[in-house]
Curated annotation (Swiss-Prot):
Organism this protein belongs to: Methylobacillus flagellatus (strain ATCC 51484 / DSM 6875 / VKM B-1610 / KT)
Protein name, as recorded: Large ribosomal subunit protein uL1
Cellular component terms (Gene Ontology): cytosolic large ribosomal subunit
Subunit structure: Part of the 50S ribosomal subunit.
Described purpose of this protein according to its UniProt entry: Binds directly to 23S rRNA. The L1 stalk is quite mobile in the ribosome, and is involved in E site tRNA release.
The organism's taxonomic lineage, starting at the top: Bacteria, Pseudomonadati, Pseudomonadota, Betaproteobacteria, Nitrosomonadales
Length: 230
């Protein structure tokens, strides 16, 4: 065990916390220092120049990463009639209406993404205390409340990620797995940065992308030079 600890410390020592790395080098370091026995997630942490106390500066949205996340998501859809059939055809894992709501109330939460048609929100709204704390509440801002549930299901299955600034104006988002090639991680990160740039609040002043760093689940954070992300 001591030898493992020494090996991990040696790998993490390769990361200079005060250095800003070119994106390709940063991601290569993340891959190299991902030492867990499982395929670690690679996450981006992006500090935005916003005032998180102001509701008009909340940055929130969703995008389909070019290379996905490396995780197959289970999708639940609250819909009925033709929309329910479309959701099933698109690959939804669980589809229902009042019956699904009752299952969720009873503790059934065997899904990673919840999608709802607008008319289903009268039912889903009552599940806020169950779905909300788990980040599963459908929301039109991220495309999970929509009449086009088939597209929403396909996006979720294709590797869609949701992003939202926290109280400190920071976005945390998975951009892949340690097993991904560097180029795939780079393209996923660039897509996330592009989406954040497009979502910049009009009232945000000064430097918007203040700091970008990447890390694996168990690894050290690596600062990224965002000038070569475009």
């Amino acid at each position: 065990m001591a030898n493992v600890s020494k090996r991990i410390k040696a790998l993490r020592a390769k990361v200079d916390r005060n250095k800003v790395y070119p994106v390709t080098e940063a991601l290569a370091l993340v891959k190299e220092t991902a030492t867990a026995k499982f395929d670690e997630s690679v996450d981006a942490v992006i500090n935005l120049g916003i005032d998180a106390r102001k509701s008009d500066q909340l940055v929130r949205g969703a995008l389909v990463l070019p290379h996905g996340t490396g995780k197959t998501k289970r999708v639940a859809v609250f819909a009925q009639g033709a929309a329910a059939e479309a959701a099933k055809a698109a690959g939804a894992d669980i589809v229902g209406f009042e019956d699904l709501a009752e299952q969720v109330k009873g503790g059934m939460l065997d899904f990673d993404v919840a999608i709802a048609t607008p008319d289903a929100m009268r039912i889903v709204g009552a599940l806020g205390q169950v779905l909300g704390p788990r980040g599963l509440m459908p929301n039109p801002k991220v495309g999970t409340v929509t009449p086009d549930v088939a597209t929403a299901v396909k996006n979720a299955k294709a590797g869609q990620v949701q992003y939202r600034t926290d109280k400190g104006g920071i976005v945390h988002c998975t951009i892949g797995r340690a097993s991904f090639e560097v180029d795939a991680l780079k393209e996923n990160l660039a897509a996330l940065v592009d989406a954040l740039n497009k979502a910049k609040p009009a009232s945000s002043k000064g430097v918007y992308l203040k700091k970008v760093s990447v890390s694996s689940t168990m690894g050290a954070g690596v600062r990224v030079d965002q000038s070569n992300l475009a």
